[in-house]
C-alpha cells in the first residue's frame, strides 16, 4: 500500500517495541503499518479486509485487532480470526490487560459481552450486559483499575446502571454508579476515577 499523504489516514495507533504501529485506511482496505516519529511509513506489517477497526492490544510480536465483527490476532505478519460476534453489526471496542489476561468488551445490539483470554487465541465469555441489568443495551468500555485492583465497566442505554466494578476479574459485578449520566471512558487515578461522558443523557436516565 502506498502512503502518499501529508497526514496518513490513521484510524488509531499504539506504541509497541519502540515503534508506532498504526491501523491505516486506504480505499476499502486496512493495513497495519510501522511508522517513525515523523509519521513516515517504515514498513507494512499486514493488510486486512475491512473499512473500520481498532488496535486493541499490542504485546511483543502479537497484535489484537477489532475488524468489523471479528477479533483478529496478527503474529509474525500472519492473521487469524480468534473471536466473532454473534451479531454481524456488533464489534469489539475496548480491551484491558491484567497480568496474563486480556479482557475485551463488545458493543452494539443487545446483548453484548465481556470476553477474556490468556493466549489471545482461546476466548471465554465472562458475562452479558443483560446479565447485569436486563434493560441495558451494551457495554461501553472496560478498563482495569490498578489502584483498587478491580475491573471497571461502563454501560447503559435503557437502564440507570452506568458503571460496574468487579474485584474477582469479571465473575461477580456490583454497581458503582446509577443515575442519569452515561459514560464511555474510565480513567482510574490514585484518589479518583475520571469518566468521559457519552453523547448525552440516554433513555432511562
Q: Which residues are covered by each model-predicted region?
A:
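Asp-box/BNR beta-propeller loop motif
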Residues: 35-42, 76-80, 115-125, 165-174
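Asp-box/WD-like beta-propeller blade repeats and closely related beta-sheet repeat scaffolds
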Residues: 79-98, 125-131
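Beta-sheet-dominated scaffold domains
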Residues: 152-156, 160-164, 173-205
